[in-house]
């Protein structure tokens, strides 16, 4: 499960890179939604064919989410077997730092579920926003129109022009949670997340009994924490600069194309 969870991110990272390029970087360069549409169509020939979309987009996403949920269930089962499901009052819990277990003797009921980390929590939130994004931009056109050949950056711009509040909430959540989850996820895979943290208490970072070395370790943890969070903020800002700064301001589509877009949004209760 751990390998599936990890290796599924490789294909998703390639897709995400292409998607950021076409929905943010290229619009930033061209400063125009119509001028950017052609590049998006070219990219679709790579990741939106009948063969590549299931293999390199849909399957990795499904595998990543399913394996993440399965890992939590497995760890819960292991906790129950290790500490005994019949004695929840003495179920060990993670300390406030989340690094180690400590036995409880206060008689309160404890959960066997593993602690929900920031990476996991952001992943579940991201999955919800991503599901809505896929439903509106991919599944809805297929269901209503039979294909999605007319769906592109102009469709997104039309959504922002017609329903700005819903669109901004959806895309801010998608970009913020998505970039945070992906950056911290990769930091975990390469071993940086385990060395990052702002907390500087002895329980969190431990002690070497050398005051100078302890200070250096705490400073290093904080530097790594700042670098990872800074990378997440930078990634979000780059994506938002083109996506929200250019595409979202592209204005509504007109003519029969605009009518098609209105009918699609009306199908999910977003009519005028």
Residue ranges and their predicted role:
Residues 1-272:
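Membrane-embedded alpha-helical bundles that constitute the cytochrome b-like, heme-associated redox core
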